[in-house]
Amino acid sequence: NSWGTEFGEDGYFYVSYEDANIGTTNVVYTKLGDANNFDNIYQSDLLGWRGQLGYEKDQAYFANVYRAGEDEELAAVSFYATDVDTTYQVYVVPEFEDEDSLNDRKLVAEGSFEQAGYYTVRLDEAVKLKDNQKFAVVVHIQTPGAIHPVAIEYDADSRTREFDITDGEGYI
């Protein structure tokens, strides 16, 4: 049990083979990328996929804003597909100032995923960034049949409430 002694009875718990809920929502990582693929990582998912949001539609835009730590090139982005047959478009706003800047996005990659999961998408062409430059990554995602296609993090329960997830600026 990776949840420690705080879960169940000192870390032990009973699961019936006839449990109606076990195995209905699982996340499994079957292919891991090399940790040295890229020089830097900018992230806003310190807790990982904890829930989903959307607007009762199968598609949505979401964005995260970052500040470059040095002169560099943005070569890839990573995000979740919450179900099968998901299509996406990835955009970058190289000079982010405020919400209105999101309208100045540039398409840098598009494609589809057959399965749900966490994916790293290489950009068609790397985006040059200057040290301290504020930029945004915008993803438009469409997941047929979904009403909440965007994976999100939040303080879902006692195991996650102690984490500070105010690390950045995000939009849905």
What does each model-identified segment do?
Residues N1-F7, Y12:
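Catalytic nucleophile-His microenvironment captured as a short glycine-rich beta-strand/loop
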Residues A60, G117-Y118:
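Repeat-based blade/solenoid architectures
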Residues Y118-A126:
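Exposed aromatic-hydrophobic patches
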